[in-house]
């Protein structure tokens, strides 16, 4: 990032050992860390809903009153590989990120706080819209938006080899110089050891 920023990890882990490992890494590198409350009311297998509820909580509890000019949400397996200045986009338009049909996916999501504060943000998925995490923002933040009029991220999906799919052998390259490695939590139940060796080597280049 070339624009001044504050990076905080909002940890939605259910495993205490993993959460402590994440916290230790954050403390080592001076990154903010907040452990989110457990979501005992959400059934196993509802990962998108859990993600949306977590985003709603952290926005209303921390970001809404945080004093920032902008805020952004990043998935846990997305990394910048080029210099990035979000203000280039947010000075021209009130949001930027990766479009999923009628909304911006909250794994790569940036918005001006001024406009966000005027809307009822809701990052939950929508069964009615058949949308993933963040789809409910189509009813508020992005209602009536003609996305073709905005500059947004384009995504190119790539595989390390011709074997497998993006979940066990691939990643996405974003036009703004970011990489989404996919399936870091292995919610798809794949053998991802080789993939993560490839990803680590790729990111270190």
Model-derived segments and their meaning:
Residues 36-46, 102-103, 155-163:
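A short acidic, often aromatic-flanked loop/helix-cap motif at beta-alpha or helix-coil junctions
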Residues 6-8, 148:
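A structural signal for isolated positions on well-ordered beta-strands in alpha/beta enzyme cores
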Residues 15-68:
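Active-site-proximal specificity loops/subdomain of glycosyltransferases
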Residues 1-5:
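Short, acidic, metal-binding catalytic loop of nucleotide-sugar glycosyltransferases
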Residues 71:
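Short aromatic/hydrophobic "clamp" motif used to bind/position activated sugar donors
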Residues 132-205:
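C-terminal catalytic/acceptor-binding lobe
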Residues 48, 78-143:
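Conserved catalytic core of nucleotide-sugar-dependent glycosyltransferases
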């Amino acid at each position: 990032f070339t624009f001044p920023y504050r990076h905080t990890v909002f940890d939605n882990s259910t495993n205490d050992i993993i959460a402590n490992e994440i916290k230790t890494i954050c403390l080592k590198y001076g990154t903010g860390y907040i452990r989110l409350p457990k979501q005992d009311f959400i059934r196993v297998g509802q990962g998108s809903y859990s993600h949306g509820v977590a985003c709603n909580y952290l926005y209303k509890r921390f970001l809404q009153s945080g004093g920032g000019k902008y805020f952004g949400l990043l998935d846990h397996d997305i990394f910048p590989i080029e210099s990035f200045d979000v203000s280039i986009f947010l000075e021209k338009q009130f949001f930027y990120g990766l479009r999923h049909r009628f909304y911006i996916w909250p794994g790569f999501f940036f918005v001006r706080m001024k406009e966000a504060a005027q809307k009822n943000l809701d990052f939950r998925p929508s069964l009615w819209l058949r949308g993933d995490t963040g789809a409910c923002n189509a009813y508020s933040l992005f209602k009536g938006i003609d996305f073709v009029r905005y500059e947004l991220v384009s995504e190119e999906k790539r595989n390390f080899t011709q074997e497998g799919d993006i979940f066990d052998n691939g990643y996405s390259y974003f036009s703004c110089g970011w990489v989404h490695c996919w399936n870091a939590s292995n919610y798809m139940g794949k053998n991802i050891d080789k993939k993560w060796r490839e990803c680590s080597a790729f990111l270190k280049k």
